[in-house]
């Protein structure tokens, strides 16, 4: 997926199966790999996968989570994740947040 923004209030996404609109929700599947390309927004809107809005970073299976240099996040969803409800969130703007459900 590739990110876009709606000011400092929302992320938008393009890519296979991406829902239009602000801060869309995602369903990610166990064992699948997802790449989020946030290179065009990394300076102003760094994206991080978290356990909850404002919570700690979710690190299991995630490489380059909140990479302030490349803006790329790769998430290999574990077969037995410790959490099945996660969020993606801008580390600078709390309103830029959406849900990730793991099935």
Q: Residue spans of the language-model regions?
A:
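Extracellular/periplasmic metallocenter environments
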Residues: 1-8, 15-19, 41-44, 64-103
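Aromatic/hydrophobic beta-strand junction motif of beta-rich domains
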Residues: 13, 36-38
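Surface-exposed ligand/attachment interfaces on beta-rich extracellular proteins
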Residues: 18-21, 25-27
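Structural beta-strand segments of beta-rich domains
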Residues: 24, 32-34
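Solvent-exposed, conformationally flexible loop/turn segments
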Residues: 29-31, 70
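Beta-strand signatures of extracellular beta-sandwich domains
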Residues: 35, 46-50
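Short edge-strand/loop segments of extracellular domains
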Residues: 50-56
């Amino acid at each position: 997926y590739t990110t876009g923004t709606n000011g400092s209030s929302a992320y938008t996404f393009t890519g296979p199966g991406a829902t239009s609109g602000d801060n869309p929700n995602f369903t990610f599947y166990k064992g699948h790999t997802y790449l989020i390309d946030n290179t065009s927004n990394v300076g102003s809107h760094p994206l991080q996968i978290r356990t909850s809005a404002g919570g700690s970073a979710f690190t299991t299976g995630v490489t380059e989570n909140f990479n302030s240099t490349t803006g790329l996040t790769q998430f290999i969803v574990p077969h037995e994740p410790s959490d099945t409800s996660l969020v993606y969130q801008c580390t600078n703007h709390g309103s830029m947040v959406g849900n990730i459900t793991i099935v």
